[in-house]
Amino acid sequence: MRLAFQLSYDGNQFRGSQLQPAYRTVEGELITACQRVQLFDDPCKAGFALAGRTDRGVHARGQVGAFSTPFPERAVEALNGQLSPDLWCNGFAEVPPSFHPRFDAISRTYRYFFADWPLDIRAMDQAAAALIGTHDFSRLARVREKSPIRTVKSARVFQDRGIPVFEVTAHTYLWHMVRCMAAALLLIGTHEREPELMERLLSGKCRRNPPAAPADGLVLWDVDCGVTFTPTEPDPRSRDWIGSARREAMVRERIIGLLDRSGVDRRGKEPGDDSGRDLL
């Protein structure tokens, strides 16, 4: 039987999601947990896959994974029983044998939690609206793919219990695309740039790209694969640190603390970095 799982993780202690020998990754932890309880031996033969890759330090609330196993009845309980406290399963569903979370994904939604306040939310939301539609995102990403053209379905900036949040939904993204968009919005929110900056970036009229915002504020919020998940029993170790009542305090502590330790100021720039001024 093929099963799909909705997964959450705190990305701080992972070297990204993709399997890498000698490093702790989300895929590595999941595969090891499955093999430990003999859900499968070979991840390739089991068709193990995730819906999307996340970089080092990026978190997830709604990542989707899938694999095939001859022991579906014990898969759900076994997974949460074997996983570490910073990685857990929120839901599961039986899916067709051909289901692949990456290729069957209809859309992926990210949220970026800003460690800066107050910000001009109205100006940021106005600028975010310019992202909607099909554009060349060369100036808002690090382009590795053949085409820099992507289509954004929705984009908005709002406050959630006092924390400024940028939410964007698209089918696929370029590398660092969301973090570069967040960095540009931050320049607008701090009044270092006008909302028209976003349109100038999309039209290619700016001389350089904005630097990518720190990874620690980024959350893979949801992946829509057209699957309805059955919620799992709450695991006592699981910490819905982005969705719980403690989220605000934890986001402030995690993100600001990490920025302070990394020498990045609260505008997401290295000390002395005037890259925001050089955009135009």
From Swiss-Prot:
EC numbers for this chain: 5.4.99.12
Key word tRNA processing present: yes
Top-level enzyme category: isomerase
GO BP annotations listed: tRNA pseudouridine synthesis
Annotated CDD domains: PseudoU_synth_EcTruA (cd02570)
Pfam families hit by this protein: PseudoU_synth_1
Disulfide bonds: none
Protein residues bound to substrate: Y110
SUPFAM superfamilies membership: Pseudouridine synthase
InterPro entries: PsdUridine_synth_cat_dom_sf, PsdUridine_synth_TruA, PsdUridine_synth_TruA_a/b_dom, PsdUridine_synth_TruA_C, TruA/RsuA/RluB/E/F_N
This protein's UniProt keywords: Isomerase, tRNA processing
Superkingdom of origin: Archaea
Catalysed reaction, written as an equation: uridine(38/39/40) in tRNA = pseudouridine(38/39/40) in tRNA
Active site (UniProt): D55
GO molecular function: RNA binding; tRNA pseudouridine(38-40) synthase activity
Primary role: Formation of pseudouridine at positions 38, 39 and 40 in the anticodon stem and loop of transfer RNAs.
Family stated for the protein in its record: Belongs to the tRNA pseudouridine synthase TruA family.
Protein name: tRNA pseudouridine synthase A
Lineage of source species: Archaea, Methanobacteriati, Methanobacteriota, Stenosarchaea group, Methanomicrobia
